[in-house]
Curated annotation (Swiss-Prot):
GO terms for molecular function: isomerase activity. This is Diels-Alderase tas3. The keyword Metal-binding does not apply. The gene is tas3. Diels-Alderase; part of the gene cluster that mediates the biosynthesis of the tetramic acids Sch210971 and Sch210972, potential anti-HIV fungal natural product that contain a decalin core. The PKS module of tasS together with the enoylreductase tasC catalyze the formation of the polyketide unit which is then conjugated to 4-hydroxyl-4-methyl glutamate (HMG) by the condensation domain of the tasS NRPS module. It comes from Hapsidospora irregularis. Pfam families: DA_C (PF22903), DA_N (PF24137). Pathway: Secondary metabolite biosynthesis.
Length: 397
């Protein structure tokens, strides 16, 4: 039996200041249907993220469909950021007053999900995403004349598992981040339109990724929270990368000092498609190089108990400085698997090409980079190289 579940938002009616309970987390599901299906509180955020990057780092795109109040009363936004090998970038929000999401399947956690961000009923300007019920494929389509038209298609390479519990999906208290499709082969065929410098004309530029002899990878991420980051978080770092046989993913949120919560991450490391490390606990490097357990007064995690991740900002050597408070040139990541036979893998990312830069205040904002990635298993003497993309968000402390 196939049921149809529908969540339809109109910007003037669907955002409220009242508390709105979120729907339950669904184990072993992509959790793609909205957690706030009827209305969303002004402080809450839901997002569906799709991305692709050429394996040689030459070009990339990220697309994020949002349901939140940031663009209200104009509408609900889609953040689109594209990067070409010559350093050209295209980054603009697309804003639509309506958002419709449907799930077709035996239950709300197992259906094929379609999202449509659109203008009025009779308008052809819209953007859609579609994710198969078995999470095998995803497709994003833009039909926004004068801005962007074309498609991003993803075919899953089977890099699961999905979270078995809400805690496994928590990147921070009550902030959820998961990879509905963790790794996919990607193809992009889009055309972007930009105004000329004098504003008298426009230019069009195609973005083609993952075709011919230049393969590409990407994925689908899903996040939601009832309280926005600005109230609880000072920093975040996102990475999707490939280095030889390794695929690296992580999302790290650092809370404000008064939150005093145990530092966690949504992270995974694969070798040849096999999950070898899935840290949820983070052992944090402070900026003076001292290794501590985050929220040391309450954490009991030690190396060897569980999979862990150490994240250290790099300030010396190759790389472009991040534009906001930290000005780091990359990161060192240390994945350690738990148990008596635990192994450690160490990787370095370096900012090679600036992507987007969006200031929000003194020393704060969001930025993105195409990054080189180097590393492998510690003590093995063999290092692998690859590429990925990294996003940083810096918020007031």
């Amino acid at each position: 039996m196939v049921d149809i579940f529908t969540s339809e938002f109109t910007v003037g009616e669907s955002i409220t200041t009242d508390p709105i309970p979120e729907s339950d987390f669904i184990p072993n599901s992509g959790n793609l249907f909205p957690k706030f299906p009827d209305q969303i509180r002004k402080t809450a955020v839901e997002v569906w993220l799709f991305d692709a990057i050429a394996e040689d780092g030459s070009s990339a795109i990220t697309i994020s469909f949002f349901r939140d109040a940031l663009a209200a009363p104009a509408g609900f936004r889609i953040a689109v950021n594209a990067s070409w090998s010559d350093g050209t970038i295209w980054g603009k929000p697309l804003i639509f007053p309506k958002s419709l999401i449907t799930s077709k399947g035996p239950d709300v956690g197992s259906g094929a999900v379609t999202g449509v961000w659109r203008t009025d009923e009779d308008s052809s300007s819209h953007a859609t995403f579609e994710v198969a019920a078995d999470l095998s494929t995803a497709k994003v389509t833009f039909d926004v004349p004068g801005k962007v038209v074309g498609t991003l298609e993803l075919k899953s390479l089977g890099f699961h598992p999905l979270p078995r519990s809400a805690r496994e999906a928590e990147a921070a208290p009550s902030i959820y981040w998961m990879r509905s499709i963790a790794k996919a082969a990607a193809t992009v065929d889009m055309v972007f339109t930009s105004p000329s410098a004098d504003g008298e004309s426009t230019t069009e530029r195609p973005l083609v990724i993952g075709k011919d002899e230049n393969p590409a990878f990407g994925g689908v991420d899903r996040s939601w929270e009832s309280v926005g980051w600005t109230q609880a978080v000072t920093d975040s770092v996102f990475l999707r990368a490939k280095s030889g046989p390794y695929d690296l993913h992580f999302m790290l949120l650092v809370g404000k000092a008064e939150q005093d919560y145990r530092l966690t991450a949504s992270a995974s490391l694969y070798r040849d498609g096999e999950l070898v490390c899935a840290p949820h606990d983070v052992l944090h490097h402070t900026e003076d190089g001292i290794t501590t357990g985050a929220a040391a007064a309450t954490t009991t995690t030690t190396r060897g108990d569980v999979d862990t991740l150490v994240v250290k900002k790099l300030f010396e050597g190759e790389g472009l400085p991040a534009p906001f408070r930290h000005q780091n040139v990359g990161y060192q990541l240390e994945y350690t698997s738990g148990g008596p036979d635990g192994k450690t893998w160490v990787f370095e990312t370096r900012h090679q090409r600036a992507w987007y830069r969006k200031p929000t205040g003194p020393g704060t904002g969001s930025s993105g980079f195409i990054v080189s990635v180097t590393g492998g298993e510690a003590g093995k003497g063999k290092s692998f190289q690859g590429w990925g993309y990294e996003g940083q968000v810096v918020l007031p402390e």
